[in-house]
A protein has these predicted regions:
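N-terminal/domain-start alpha-helical segments
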Residues: 1-95
Length: 95
């Protein structure tokens, strides 16, 4: 069975690039364009990994990560154009 990856990214070009690469490598993927949809897809898709943009509409990546961490330890890789140290520290602290 293929490993499942949730791509939570509102930039369609980035989402499609990640999707194309991961599918080529044999992963089963789903794309969520906003934080609300990301949580909805997460709960039904049960991914093995989440690629999560910090700056999402509806609910930001920090909030999505917090909701996931309330009940689960699925690995999350935070994606962002932000380069501030506080963003890196916050991501690491959230697990």
């Amino acid at each position: 069975m293929a490993r499942k990856v949730l791509i939570a990214e509102d930039d369609n070009n980035i989402a499609e690039l990640l999707n194309l690469y991961l599918r080529k490598e044999g992963y089963d993927t789903l794309i969520a364009p906003d934080g609300g949809k990301a949580l909805e897809v997460y709960r039904s898709f049960r991914p093995d990994l989440v690629l999560l943009d910090i700056m999402l509409p509806v609910m930001d990546g920090w909030a999505v990560c917090g909701k996931i961490r309330e009940t689960d330890k699925t690995p999350i890789i935070m994606l962002t154009a932000k380069g501030e140290t506080i963003d890196k520290v916050t991501g690491l602290e959230m697990g």
